[in-house]
Every structure is written in structure tokens, then in C-alpha cells.
Amino acid sequence: RDSSTSRGLGDVYKRQGLGSANFGTVVQVGEYVALLLGYRRIELYGVDHTLLDGLCVDDANRLCRADRHYYDAGPRAPQPIYMKVPHVPYTMSVYLAEVAELFRGHEVLRDYAASLGARIVNRTRGSMIDAYERGAE
């Protein structure tokens, strides 16, 4: 993992806008930009990251997910989850590794915010992100 020296150097690059972590979502990039712009309190709404809900493996041994949204009328049938390149179904191990990296990005943002004296508050009910302090929605 990161040594304290590399984390410190990384923060110097981040403060100058010369580097960032491996962020996996536009939300994370938005948080980073807000911190660069000097915001000291960032509140998240609607960022649930329920990427593990509805996971299953079908009879063809493909990783699938029943992706649900608040506007759906009912449950959706699980669909295979495909990698972008190459366009093949994810394996469980690859998918979980990518999801873990996504959540690690939130920990990096939390630590970077703290180094600036800023706070990130997650106000999303049911969110799976555990890196930030919680607040009522």
C-alpha cells in the first residue's frame, strides 16, 4: 500500500491539480474538482453505489446483475455485466476488484478532504459508501 511519504507527495500533486487518484465515477471527479476549487463542505445526495445488489451467476456461468432504479415499476431480470474492452462478461473476481477500487477512491477523497480541512458528508439513505460521515437526507 501507499507509504506516508507517497501519500504526502500525492497530496502536493492533488493540491496543484496535477494528479488525482484512479476515480471510477463522475461523482468522484466532481468531489475532487470541488476540493480543488476550495469548497470545504461537500454533501452527496443520490450516491448509493449499490453495485453489489442483485448480483448472481446465470446458468451459462456469466456474472449478472438485476439493476434496479427508483423509477422502475418492478423487479428487472438479471442481465450479464460486460467489460468494455474486451467485450466479455465480467468474472466475479474482476468485478469485485473494480468495485473495491471504486470504493478505495472514496477513501482517498476522504483523506484528501481531511488534509485540506474539508468535509464530505454522504446524505444518501441506503448508500454503500462507508468512507464519509453520514448525514440525514
Please provide the spans of the model-predicted regions.
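Short Gly/charged-rich anion-binding patches and loops
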Residues: 8, 29, 108
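Short, surface-exposed, charged loop/turn segments at secondary-structure junctions
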Residues: 48-73
